[in-house]
Amino acid sequence: MKKSSKLILILILSTILLFCLGILYLECANEDKVAILGYHSILPSKINDSGDNLVVDAEKFEKELKLLKKLGYHTMTLDEFYCWKNGECKKKENSVLITFDDGYKNNYDYAFEILKKYDMNAVVFCVGAYMEANSDIHMNIETIEKAKEEYPNIEFASHSYNLHFHSDKTYEIVDNDAKKMNKLLETSYYAYPFGDYNEDYVKALKDNDYDMAFTFGPSKEHRKADLSDNNYKVPRLNISNDMSIIKFLLRLILPM
């Protein structure tokens, strides 16, 4: 009897939880905010032994895309997001923006095919120095050009030429870096390395014809993007390997 009472209680609580999530989902469907999902590496679980939470299992990534598809989410392009952000056009109901940082080759090897399977758009923020390095870890220029042909749903934008480990980000340093990157990749969108920026950084990007820049991480307002955000300080939501599907869902529907 005790066991059956516990089971009934669990069922009641589960029903209440699902009902509450449903209400939240309906309320947030048309809100003027967009969840920008931030990924890095994608690897099949059988070879994902790094212990780094930024390396997401490919199977987990696919489950997240399945959920987006099931809930009717539209994955925006950068131009769609920019158009909405500037108040020039309306976004589709339940819109998200999927991003990847650093330009890992495993994005090409695993993530792109999964995105294509579910007919979803995404953007990869590439590091110029890695593009020219021809390593096995990051996509080089040749791989990126190949990806553009094979996966027209994938966009490529700037993650700096080589500012990840530059502690002193003065106007001159950022300006020179941006000019170097512009020779490799034609884009007007940018993601700050580690989400770090200052006003000199922002000015240098503006002077190099970047229209929008994205931040990252809890210290950089870990929340959805909204219309009031500065175009050069757009927040993103980090997606990690230890994140449950429920937590992922909450990232999508909570009004924050």
Where are these regions (language model features)?
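Short beta-strand and adjacent tight-turn residues that come in two discontinuous sequence segments
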Residues: 125, 213-215
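Binuclear metal-dependent phosphoesterase catalytic core
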Residues: 220-226, 230-256
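Metal-dependent polysaccharide deacetylase catalytic core of the NodB/CE4 family, i.e.
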Residues: 37-44, 51, 94-96, 105, ...
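Short phosphate-binding/catalytic loops that engage adenosine nucleotides
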Residues: 73, 120, 210
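Short secondary-structure boundary segments
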Residues: 194, 216-218
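Extracellular/periplasmic catalytic domains that process cell-envelope and extracellular macromolecules
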Residues: 28-31, 89-92, 117, 148-151, ...
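Noncatalytic alpha-helical scaffolds and linker/capping helices
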Residues: 101-102
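N-terminal pre-catalytic segment of deacetylase/amide-hydrolase enzymes
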Residues: 2-96, 241-256
